[in-house]
């Protein structure tokens, strides 16, 4: 019998905990907890723990801390100031206060509102940290904060908002109906407290007391004059009222109340507050109209999330004349890529920041409410500023391998930036004008290079790619600062590597910003590169050195420089750049490849008649061997050429290289190739004594990913599979 009672109590506690979850999703949090090793979740988790650790020493806040007391004289009475009301400058005493919509009065800090929000946020943080980490110190601190604000007879708040958002000089200092919204932060807090129910610190007695407290607050909201007046509002306040009432009802175990509000919501709120074109007329009148248009829809989304817990779905309801939540969401989402002056209402401040809030809510809808809205997912990915440490990541986001890769890359690049900045200050680097990193040796020594080095554009190119993915201005600023120091390379006619140097740096900057200054550099670099083209050979010369051995060397690497030329013809309409690129690709296709699809590294020509003098290697094991990176240059190069020309010969050849790579003898099981696939020892399975070439693997993975998009289903599956294998292996190595 004792075991039965204990089991029943445990099941009831678990059931009440699940029901009490309102906006947060327990299933999602369980998945997050199991995947904290992933870079994306790990970054947010570490930020959460850092925040939680900082809270362990804070003093609990309570309504007893405020500098002023409600007219009732009871210090336990919650008291807050109407946010947008300020002293009347025309009155000696400033009374009554007057409205300045959208402008917060700093006197708000003298009252309870900010401390309520801060307490709720602290409890949410500590509870989530306990759930994910298991440190009972977090649960104990959260319990201490809950006790001080809600339960301790000496410090607790009365369960009402009778004096919330009062206006000095009006109604004898009594609160207004709008003050009910001050408790909105309780919603997430209660989700956190529901997690705490599994901790040692949070007792069943405290849990019962808190449910009773919030039950009393719910009764006050449902029956008081202020509560009823708030429920009757025609704007975001009534929607926020419904959201709070549903959350309190779920927490207090009064599902009938929650279900009634949810069932009435479409007719009572949605269809009355949203116009057929998606505008919200009451919110559009505000001085922060974009903010409030979204703010109201956030409440909608919270309601839809809570409705799911009760098996109800109302987000898809549409009025006879077309009013719906999705009309409203689509309306504000359509301005995510538009400037403020295009918004049809007034928005005094905070437009860009609010767009980030809109993007996050698009994700919440697509992830938890209507999973068919892939357009919302895409728009979120396109417009959000990537911040792995954002709490949103833990609560709502599901990262993929690309997200994790960019988190790891971001960490590495931030460290690299600090190292580069230190190295550039050293006299030897400064005197030789070394500006960007080339490599770091096994002892951690970083090597910088001059603007004319073939890898000088790699680092700024990576920074521009970080900016492209993250939309974070930090990466743009860093990319700019590491791009312009190599500008002089645009005149460097002694190299074939201008595509590597300028195309990936200035070219990417031009692509992402559209700024003329970047375009001008890329055009000059393209002109300079074309000076190395010999019409008799029909290809761009590679090296100028070793003239005693070579007369006109062309290396397979040069395929990578053609992309800059193709893009320049597309942008200018001048065919000469494309003509050079096509000629070079054709000559290389004719002379560089063996029948099986593998490539020589170097082909030397006689510039007098264009004939082939010799075929050899310079970086591979032997003249007839398979230098892995060279095979990658070819695969990516011809796939890229097909992208610009749609010439089937290029596509066919790219596939030939890919198929050769798929079937080459001696390939390690993870498909990260040895540095050369004909070096002695490749016949030994996964030979640990032969260096691998991760750069070749990355290059091949990029080529395969694009090539798969041009291939039939069966062949694409092979390419995608291998690309994924290579990518995951490289990601795994990057995390070590």
Q: Which positions does each model-derived feature cover?
A:
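Short, intrinsically disordered/low-complexity patches at protein termini
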Residues: 3, 16, 55, 162-164, ...
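Contiguous, well-ordered alpha-helical segments that form the cores/surfaces of helical PPI scaffolds
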Residues: 3, 8, 120-128, 147, ...
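Extracellular glycan-targeting catalytic surfaces
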Residues: 19-228, 263-266, 308-309, 316-470, ...
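Short helix/strand-bridging catalytic loops that position acidic/His residues to coordinate divalent metals
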Residues: 168-173, 230, 279-288, 314, ...
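Glycan-recognition and catalytic cores of secretory/periplasmic carbohydrate-active enzymes
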Residues: 94, 137-140, 144, 153-159, ...
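Bacterial Sec-dependent N-terminal signal peptides
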Residues: 1-21
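Flexible, glycine-rich surface segments
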Residues: 240-320
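Long, charge-rich low-complexity segments
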Residues: 248, 289-299, 305-306, 343-371, ...
């Amino acid at each position: 019998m004792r075991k039965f009672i204990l089991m029943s109590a445990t099941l009831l506690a678990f059931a009440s905990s699940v029901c009490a979850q309102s906006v947060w999703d327990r299933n999602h949090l369980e998945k997050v907890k199991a995947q904290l090793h992933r870079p994306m979740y790990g970054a947010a988790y570490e930020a959460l723990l850092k925040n939680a650790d900082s809270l362990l020493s804070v003093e609990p806040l309570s309504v007893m801390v405020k500098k002023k007391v409600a007219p009732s004289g009871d210090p336990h009475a919650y008291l807050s100031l109407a946010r947008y009301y300020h002293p009347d400058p025309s009155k000696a005493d400033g009374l009554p206060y007057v409205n300045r919509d959208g402008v917060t009065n700093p006197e708000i800090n003298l009252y309870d509102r900010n401390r309520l929000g801060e307490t709720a946020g602290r409890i949410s943080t500590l509870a989530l940290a306990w759930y994910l980490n298991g440190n009972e110190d977090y649960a104990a601190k959260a319990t201490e904060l809950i006790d001080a604000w809600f339960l301790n007879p000496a410090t607790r708040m009365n369960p009402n908002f009778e004096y919330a958002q009062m206006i000095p000089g009006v109604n004898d200092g009594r609160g207004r109906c709008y003050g009910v919204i001050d408790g909105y932060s309780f919603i997430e807090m209660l989700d956190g407290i529901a997690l705490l129910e599994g901790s040692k610190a949070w007792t069943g007695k405290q849990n019962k007391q808190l449910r009773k407290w919030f039950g009393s607050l719910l009764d006050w909201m449902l029956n008081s004059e202020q509560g009823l007046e708030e429920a009757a509002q025609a704007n975001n306040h009534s929607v926020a009222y419904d959201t709070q009432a549903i959350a309190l009802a779920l927490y207090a175990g009064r599902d009938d109340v929650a279900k009634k509000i949810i069932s009435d919501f479409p007719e009572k709120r949605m269809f009355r507050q949203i116009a057929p074109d998606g505008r919200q007329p009451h919110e559009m009148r505000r001085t922060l109209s974009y903010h409030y248009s979204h703010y109201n829809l956030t409440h909608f989304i919270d309601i839809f999330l809570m409705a799911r817990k009760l098996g109800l779905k109302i987000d898809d309801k549409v009025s006879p004349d077309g009013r719906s939540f999705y009309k409203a969401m689509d309306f504000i989402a359509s301005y995510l890529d538009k400037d403020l002056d295009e918004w049809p209402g007034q928005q005094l401040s905070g437009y860009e920041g609010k767009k980030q809030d809109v993007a996050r809510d698009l994700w919440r809808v697509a992830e938890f409410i209507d999973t068919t809205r892939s357009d919302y997912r895409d728009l979120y990915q396109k417009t959000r500023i990537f911040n792995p440490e954002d709490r949103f990541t833990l609560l709502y986001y599901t990262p993929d391998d690309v997200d994790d890769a960019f988190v790891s890359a971001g960490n590495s690049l931030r460290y690299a930036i600090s190292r580069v900045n230190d190295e550039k200050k050293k006299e030897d680097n400064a005197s030789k004008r070394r500006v960007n990193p080339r490599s770091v040796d096994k002892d951690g020594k970083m090597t910088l290079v001059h603007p004319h080095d073939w890898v000088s554009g790699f680092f700024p190119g990576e920074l521009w790619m970080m900016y492209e993915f993250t939309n974070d201005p930090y990466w743009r600023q860093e990319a700019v600062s590491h791009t312009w120091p190599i500008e002089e390379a645009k005149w460097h006619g002694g190299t074939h590597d201008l595509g590597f140097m300028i195309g990936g740096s200035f070219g990417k900057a031009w692509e992402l910003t559209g700024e003329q200054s970047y375009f001008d550099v890329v055009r000059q670099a393209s002109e300079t590169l074309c000076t190395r083209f010999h019409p008799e050979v029909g290809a761009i010369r590679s090296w100028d050195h070793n003239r005693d051995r070579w007369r006109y060397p062309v290396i397979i690497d040069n395929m990578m420089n053609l992309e800059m030329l193709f893009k320049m013809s597309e942008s200018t309409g001048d065919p000469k750049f494309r003509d050079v690129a096509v000629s070079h690709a054709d000559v290389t296709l004719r002379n560089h490849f063996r029948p099986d699809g593998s490539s020589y590294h170097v082909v030397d020509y006689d510039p007098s008649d264009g004939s082939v003098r010799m075929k050899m290697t310079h970086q591979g094991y032997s003249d007839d061997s398979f230098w892995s990176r060279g095979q990658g240059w070819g695969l990516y190069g011809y796939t890229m050429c097909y992208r610009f020309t749609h010439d089937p010969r290029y596509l066919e050849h790219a596939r030939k290289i890919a198929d050769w790579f798929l079937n080459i003898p001696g390939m390690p099981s993870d498909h990260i190739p040895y540095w050369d696939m004909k070096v002695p020892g490749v016949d030994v399975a996964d030979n640990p004594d032969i260096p691998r070439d991760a750069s070749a693997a990355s290059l091949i993975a990029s080529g395969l990913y694009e090539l798969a998009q041009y291939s039939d289903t069966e062949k694409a599956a092979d390419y995608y599979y291998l690309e994924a294998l290579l990518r995951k292996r490289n990601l795994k190595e990057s995390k070590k």
